[in-house]
């Protein structure tokens, strides 16, 4: 059936901010979908609150709404745009839940909007656990025995029937939020209690434990003519009990017999038919009991998911793109496969390689969190690698993580340590893979480890094989060709071989190259080379035949940012993709090197060629060598992907590779304290007093000179890793004692901490002569909170033009002094009207996408062209990429936005609800100099107060417009909050506070009821404490600033209670003052929805009328 002609416009719902469990894979699938819809000639309307996505670029939709994804806001967009259809299957759980709400409350019917890509009945059958159980039974398969409960007393009755341990799963949450394993009644109270709150339907499923069974998933697609394809089978390395997003996964499944696989296939096809998914994809998860072979269907997702992004990258089969075409009425046999151009989408992909995905965690950011892996997803990113066998793919994936200790350690193991390693491996943690491999190296048997961990013996034998190769390397008198080739085929890096043979890495590389042992590059082509592939999507292997074609023009290589992590996320991928788009448009051949399966950059048609490879020096040099021998290399971009490629800059330059854009010397100069201080001196700028120390004596001397409080941190970090504000000498001693690896090359840096300063963030472009100021952002929280976690506003709302002009001059001087060609990000602090320079980063920063969306100027594209020699003047005139000069008609830049320009607020999204201490409490939500957010949202409006209110709603932290507010602040903050609290009381809010704060408020004529502190406990009359009130749902917002020492305990309990039930919890005075303004605005004005395209027109109009 050809496509439907009755649909003229479609509204697509995105997935909002990046949170654990719902990450960049939805930007990847959404971007593909928008392209298809545009190609098919539809008017496309998008709503997505995340500015760091490619899909919110104005060119991908006709109307792009960066607005909170809530049913109320989406209804406003529907009323304004009147779309014919709504496509909700590309925005994860957020989009599905919103679509279900709009259907239930009659909005879709009222405006005559049809749901495409999924029907509500199919979603409910797939997502509602009770209904899905019925589906599985009707298909002749079985589910785990279970009970659905809606209250705690029902849960206790169910537990008596099922027996402990049992699995708790709330309905309609994603990434396993609120789920867990209850081993006893106490656990059940804790986990099911939270689960009932997290589930939008207050419904929780309790099921028998299938812990230790083998877990598999199948990724499926079905069209309305009942054609079904299995895109890919995926096997989890860890048995059931670890969320699939936190497990190492392998495609295709390795340990199924053909009969077992056909059985899973038959069940899947029956289930997808019974559920009625007929225009798209879904994934179905299974558990198999290893001893009996009993198969249980765990669950299905009737939408594009994290697994489908992985399956797409693993097979080259564009699931999101094909699902979108199906939703428009096409069938699988009518859709051509882009890669082969000969086969239709109804051909199932065939793999002649192995794919391994390994998760990346961020437990170092939450030292209090319990690192045990459970059914609640905790990983923040993932790396994927492709090899000709499992061992090669596994080792490549582990080195792609770029984490200390992520690679296998082949050092010798004492036999006495083996029992301890086996015991430790029983509990799934991030270290389990290493523990298992080392236990095997120490002589443990495969049987023992299988009994302890439930990891399939086939995987254990593969680890044993790696240990054997390592032993051979250790014992070899010299490196001979057959041994070296064998090691490379099992994925050993030059660095690992050097360690095992007591050589330098450069020596191993020299010997290997002299022996002619180089990798060849194979192609991911969906058909195991049965047909020719037209899209070069490559992976390396130490095999025989090379499959790279010759190219005519020298290539421009862009190094991506590797796996997502806190501090380096999708924002850097955005800059890489923009660079590739701009350079291709300008006629260059672009080559992307990256190993993150979730991102747009690793889509097979974003660049001219894609290499799915780890971002290590060895792997990158081999890609460059391959490009050199097939047509030459013009140069490499290292400043777009964050810290990952920057670290390689100097080594690449030393190897003779041309670096485009800012040279490595300039990158080093900005990172090096002494040299950078000279740049500031010449420019007449000042930094906060600072020093460096390699011992406690040094540190004490520096801190005494500067004066406390001081900010201490290691050199060369991204995301503020290991930073702390230290208020006194005992704490300085503690920091230095705990700081690892202080060396003369890597000293600890100590800065004066500026209290009560306004922090300012600048993104700019510099071409060697001229500066274009991209944006000047003012932070809402005071200095001392990491810029990645602080809310900020553009244009700045309290800085006068005089300050902005000083910022512009300082930026020009620094860019010139450092020698930047392209993007630079500088952080300033304004204290007592003195402008301090905090740091300069000569690279694409985390705020580039936000600034680009807020001002309509795409900075990363411009920076890529500057890297190839284009000037800012040419970008203005010939390329029309940046506006004309400020002061000329229609001219402006990020430091001179006209009055009437829209105001944009960026807010961070924090993952505290995911991380629990071993006792089950939430980790503390206090912000500090170490970055902890996983993603961001943007609120944009004509007025600052409304823009701030939108940003809070988008960050799932909507401000209340009535009710009770709890206020408890440290003594130093009491004066600063009186006016704002009075305004809340005047607006009709009821103020609740503890002793000291209540007295101050009453003396200022503010009515406030007093409540008991946590430490006071429940009174004899049964009056509860503040945390009891919060947990009972009686408080609508918490405002609590920490005061040192003892009250930290009290404050922590209060903040943890607020986070655990999901009410706004504000911890800084600055943010509270702004929140009160926003609440007042929400009560007085109806907010409007405006598309980025309309904001851009308003901005140009305002500039023309200056």
Swiss-Prot record:
Residues reported to bind Mg(2+) 4: 839, 841
InterPro entries hit by this protein: ATP-grasp, ATP_grasp_subdomain_1, CarbamoylP_synth_lsu, CarbamoylP_synth_lsu_oligo, CarbamoylP_synth_lsu_oligo_sf, CbamoylP_synth_lsu-like_ATP-bd, CbamoylP_synth_lsu_CPSase_dom, MGS-like_dom
The keyword Manganese appears for this protein: yes
Binding site for Mg(2+) 2: 299, 301
Keywords: Amino-acid biosynthesis, Arginine biosynthesis, ATP-binding, Ligase, Magnesium, Manganese, Metal-binding, Nucleotide-binding, Pyrimidine biosynthesis, Repeat
Binding site residues for Mn(2+) 4: 839, 841
Stored PROSITE patterns: ATP_GRASP (PS50975), CPSASE_1 (PS00866), CPSASE_2 (PS00867), MGS (PS51855)
Residues involved in Mn(2+) 1 binding: 285, 299
UniProt-annotated binding residues for ATP 1: 129, 169, 175-176, 208, 210, 215, 241-243, 285, 299
Annotated positions binding Mg(2+) 3: 827, 839
Entry note: cofactor: Binds 4 Mg(2+) or Mn(2+) ions per subunit.
Top EC class for this record: ligase
Stretch list, region Carboxyphosphate synthetic domain: 1-402
Cofactor(s) this protein cannot do without: Mg(2+); Mn(2+)
Gene Ontology annotations of biological process type: 'de novo' UMP biosynthetic process; glutamine metabolic process; L-arginine biosynthetic process
Domain-level remarks: The large subunit is composed of 2 ATP-grasp domains that are involved in binding the 2 ATP molecules needed for carbamoyl phosphate synthesis. The N-terminal ATP-grasp domain (referred to as the carboxyphosphate synthetic component) catalyzes the ATP-dependent phosphorylation of hydrogencarbonate to carboxyphosphate and the subsequent nucleophilic attack by ammonia to form a carbamate intermediate.
Family note: Belongs to the CarB family.
Subunit structure: Composed of two chains; the small (or glutamine) chain promotes the hydrolysis of glutamine to ammonia, which is used by the large (or ammonia) chain to synthesize carbamoyl phosphate. Tetramer of heterodimers (alpha,beta)4.
The protein's name: Carbamoyl phosphate synthase large chain
Source species of the chain: Renibacterium salmoninarum (strain ATCC 33209 / DSM 20767 / JCM 11484 / NBRC 15589 / NCIMB 2235)
């Amino acid at each position: 059936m050809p496509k439907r002609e009755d649909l003229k416009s479609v509204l697509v719902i995105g997935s909002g901010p990046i949170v654990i469990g719902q990450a960049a894979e939805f930007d990847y699938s959404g971007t593909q979908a928008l392209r298809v819809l545009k190609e098919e000639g539809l008017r496309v309307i998008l709503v997505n609150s995340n500015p760091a996505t490619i899909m919110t670029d104005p060119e991908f939709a006709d109307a792009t709404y960066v607005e909170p994804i809530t049913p109320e806001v989406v209804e406003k967009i529907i009323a304004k745009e009147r779309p014919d259809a709504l496509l909700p299957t590309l925005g994860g759980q957020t989009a599905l839940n919103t679509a279900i709400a709009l259907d239930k409350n009659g909005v879709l019917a009222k405006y005559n909007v049809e749901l495409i890509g999924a029907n509500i009945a199919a979603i409910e059958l797939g997502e509602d656990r009770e209904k899905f159980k019925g589906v599985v039974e009707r298909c002749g398969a079985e589910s785990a025995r279970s009970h659905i409960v809606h209250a705690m007393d029902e849960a206790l009755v169910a537990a008596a029937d099922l027996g402990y341990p049992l699995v708790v799963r709330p309905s309609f949450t994603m990434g396993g939020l609120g789920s867990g394993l209850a081993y006893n009644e106490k656990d059940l109270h804790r986990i099911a209690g939270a689960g009932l709150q997290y589930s939008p339907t207050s419904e929780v499923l309790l099921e028998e434990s299938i812990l230790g069974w083998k877990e598999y998933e199948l990724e499926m697609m079905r069209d309305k003519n009942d054609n079904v394809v299995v895109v890919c089978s995926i096997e989890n390395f860890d048995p059931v009990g670890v969320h699939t997003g936190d497990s190492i996964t392998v495609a295709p499944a390795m340990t199924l017999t053909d009969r077992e696989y056909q059985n899973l296939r038959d069940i899947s096809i029956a289930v997808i038919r019974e559920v009625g998914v007929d225009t798209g994809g879904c994934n179905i998860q299974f558990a198999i009991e290893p001893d009996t072979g009993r198969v249980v269907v765990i669950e299905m997702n009737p939408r594009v998911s994290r697994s489908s992004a992985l399956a797409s990258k693993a097979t080259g089969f564009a699931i999101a793109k094909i699902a979108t075409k199906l939703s428009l009425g096409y069938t699988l046999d009518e859709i051509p496969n882009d890669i082969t151009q000969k086969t239709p989408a109804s051909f199932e992909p065939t793999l002649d390689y192995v794919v391994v995905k390994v998760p990346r965690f961020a437990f170092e950011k939450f030292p209090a969190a319990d690192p045990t892996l459970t059914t609640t997803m905790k990983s923040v990113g993932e790396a994927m690698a492709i090899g000709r066998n499992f061992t090669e793919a596994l080792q490549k994936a582990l080195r792609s993580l770029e984490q200390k200790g992520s690679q296998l350690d082949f050092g010798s193991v004492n036999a006495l340590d083996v029992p301890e390693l086996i015991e430790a491996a029983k509990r799934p943690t991030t270290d389990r893979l290493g523990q298992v491999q080392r236990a095997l190296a120490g002589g443990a048997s495969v049987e023992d480890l299988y009994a302890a961990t439930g990891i399939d013996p086939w995987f254990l034998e593969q680890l044993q094989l790696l240990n054997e190769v390592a032993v051979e390397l250790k014992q070899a008198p010299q490196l001979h060709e057959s041994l070296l080739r064998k090691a490379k085929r099992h994925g050993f890096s030059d660095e690992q071989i050097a360690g095992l043979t007591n050589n330098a890495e450069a020596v191993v590389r020299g010997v290997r190259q002299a022996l002619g042992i180089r990798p060849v590059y194979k192609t991911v082509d969906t058909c195991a080379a049965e047909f020719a592939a037209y899209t070069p999507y490559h992976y390396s292997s130490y095999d025989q035949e090379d499959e790279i074609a010759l190219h005519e023009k020298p290539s421009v290589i862009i190094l991506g940012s590797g796996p997502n992590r806190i501090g380096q996320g999708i924002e850097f991928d955005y800059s890489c993709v923009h660079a590739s788009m701009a350079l291709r448009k300008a006629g260059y051949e672009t080559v992307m090197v990256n190993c993150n399966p979730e991102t747009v950059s690793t889509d097979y048609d974003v660049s001219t060629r894609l290499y799915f490879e780890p971002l290590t020096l060895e792997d990158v040099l081999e890609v460059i060598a391959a490009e050199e021998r097939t047509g030459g290399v013009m140069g490499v971009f290292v400043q777009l992907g964050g810290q990952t490629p920057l670290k390689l800059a100097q080594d690449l330059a030393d190897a003779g590779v041309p670096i485009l854009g800012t040279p490595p010397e300039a990158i080093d100069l900005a990172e090096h304290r002494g040299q950078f201080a000279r740049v500031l001196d010449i420019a007449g700028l000042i930094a906060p007093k600072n020093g460096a120390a390699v011992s406690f004596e040094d540190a004490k001397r520096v801190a005494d000179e500067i004066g406390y409080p001081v900010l201490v941190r290691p050199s060369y970090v991204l995301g503020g890793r290991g930073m702390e504000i230290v208020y006194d000498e005992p704490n300085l001693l503690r920091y230095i004692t705990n700081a690892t690896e202080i060396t003369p090359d890597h000293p600890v840096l100590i800065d004066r901490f500026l209290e009560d300063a306004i922090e300012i963030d600048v993104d700019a472009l510099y071409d060697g002569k001229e500066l274009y100021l991209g944006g000047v952002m003012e932070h809402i929280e005071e200095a001392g909170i990491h810029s990645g976690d602080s809310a900020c506003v553009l244009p700045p709302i309290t800085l006068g033009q005089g300050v902005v002009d000083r910022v512009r001059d300082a930026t020009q001087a620094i860019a010139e002094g450092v020698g930047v060609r392209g993007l630079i990000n500088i952080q300033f602090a304004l204290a007592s009207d003195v402008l301090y320079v905090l740091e300069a980063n000569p690279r694409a920063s985390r705020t580039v996408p936000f600034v680009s969306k807020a001002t309509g100027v795409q900075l990363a594209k411009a920076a890529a062209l500057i890297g190839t020699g284009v000037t800012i003047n040419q970008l203005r005139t010939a390329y029309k990429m940046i506006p004309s000069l400020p002061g000329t008609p229609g001219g402006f830049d990020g430091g001179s936005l006209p009055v009437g320009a829209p105001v944009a607020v960026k807010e961070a999204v924090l993952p505290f609800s995911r991380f629990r201490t071993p006792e089950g409490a939430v980790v503390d939500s206090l912000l500090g100099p170490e970055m902890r957010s996983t993603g961001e949202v943007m609120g944009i409006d004509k007025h600052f107060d409304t823009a701030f209110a939108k940003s809070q709603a988008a960050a799932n932290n909507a401000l209340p417009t009535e009710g009770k507010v709890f206020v408890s602040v440290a003594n130093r903050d009491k004066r600063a909050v009186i006016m704002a609290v009075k305004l809340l009381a005047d607006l009709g809010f009821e103020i609740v506070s503890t002793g000291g704060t209540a007295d101050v408020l009453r003396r200022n004529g503010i009515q406030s009821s007093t409540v008991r502190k946590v430490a006071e406990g429940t009174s004899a009359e049964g009056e509860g404490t503040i945390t009891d009130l919060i947990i009972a749902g009686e408080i609508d917002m918490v405002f609590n600033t920490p005061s040192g020492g003892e009250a930290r305990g009290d404050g922590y309990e209060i903040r943890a209670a607020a986070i655990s039930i999901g009410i706004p919890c504000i911890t800084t005075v600055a943010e509270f003052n702004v929140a009160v303004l926003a609440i007042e605005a929400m009560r007085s004005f109806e907010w409007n929805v405006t598309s980025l395209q309309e904001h851009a027109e308003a901005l140009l109009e305002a500039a023309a009328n200056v």
